[in-house]
A protein has these predicted regions:
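PLP-dependent aspartate aminotransferase-fold enzymes
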Residues: 98-204
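Glycine-rich loop-to-alpha-helix module at the N-terminal edge of alpha/beta enzyme cores
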Residues: 6-7, 21, 49-136, 143
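Tryptophan-centric aromatic hotspots in well-structured domains and transmembrane helices
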Residues: 16-18, 58, 141, 149
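Short beta-strand-to-turn element immediately C-terminal to the catalytic PLP-Schiff-base lysine
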Residues: 43, 63, 156-160
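Short, well-ordered beta-strand elements within core beta-sheets of diverse protein domains
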Residues: 41, 59-62, 177
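Active-site-adjacent loop/helix segments that line or gate small-molecule/cofactor pockets in enzymes
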Residues: 4-38, 88, 197, 201
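Active-site and channel-lining beta-strand-loop segments
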Residues: 31-52
Length: 204
């Protein structure tokens, strides 16, 4: 893959952007920038090649700059770039939902969201609404696990078990219980199949 460095613009002012999960002051002293991507690699403005080991944020699993994806997105944007989902729809959303439920037989309905964090908060609301709808609105307790990550919405950081994600925000959702985490390198570092250690935590 040949990248033209001359086409890359490096910003000379980094102050306007507030980056999530980042020490912004340190970053702006020594910025780490990606300017292009191809396949499973990112490229820095000076042309260095960096393996994308996390597929973006787990959302570029097919690789970067895949021509079929680019062509499909371009074709759709030229026809219909956006349509709201409140009280109105568009044909492809229903077609896509039908294809998904056809692939995963255990599920009969689909709700599209913009991110994992929104998905988690939506799932929590659905769970509460379901219990209220069947006459058991007193069932409001959620169970999470220490060190568990469920996004960065208020619901997700409430049931999640990463305390630094919560410490600056005061009270979260009430009625949350956190079970002990199962991460133990000493017992589970080199285990084939189901680990022998950890079953006792199910008693929590």
């Amino acid at each position: 893959y040949n990248m033209s460095i001359s086409d890359v613009t490096v910003p000379n002012d980094l102050d306007s952007l507030w980056m999530p999960f980042t020490d912004n002051r340190s970053f702006k002293k020594q910025p780490r920038l990606f300017s292009q991507a191809d396949g499973m690699y990112y490229f820095t403005p000076d042309g260095r090649k960096v393996l994308d080991g996390t597929s973006g944020l787990w959302c570029v699993n097919a690789g970067h700059r895949r021509k079929p994806i680019i062509e499909a997105v371009s074709k759709q944007v030229e026809k219909l770039d956006y349509a709201p989902g409140f009280q109105v729809g568009h044909p492809l959303s229903f077609e896509f939902a039908s294809r998904l439920t056809g692939m995963v037989k255990e599920y009969s309905h689909v709700m599209f969201t913009n991110s994992g964090s929104e998905s988690v908060d939506t799932a929590l609301k659905i769970a509460l609404a379901y219990q209220r709808n069947i006459g058991q609105g007193n069932r409001t307790r959620f169970v999470g696990r220490e060190r568990g990550y469920h996004g960065v919405g208020f619901g997700g950081i409430s049931v999640g078990g990463i305390s630094p994600n919560r410490k600056m925000f005061g009270n979260m959702l009430t009625g949350i219980e956190h079970l002990k985490h199962t991460h133990n390198i000493e017992h589970n570092a080199c285990v084939k199949g189901q680990p022998e250690w950890g079953a006792h935590l199910a008693d929590d």
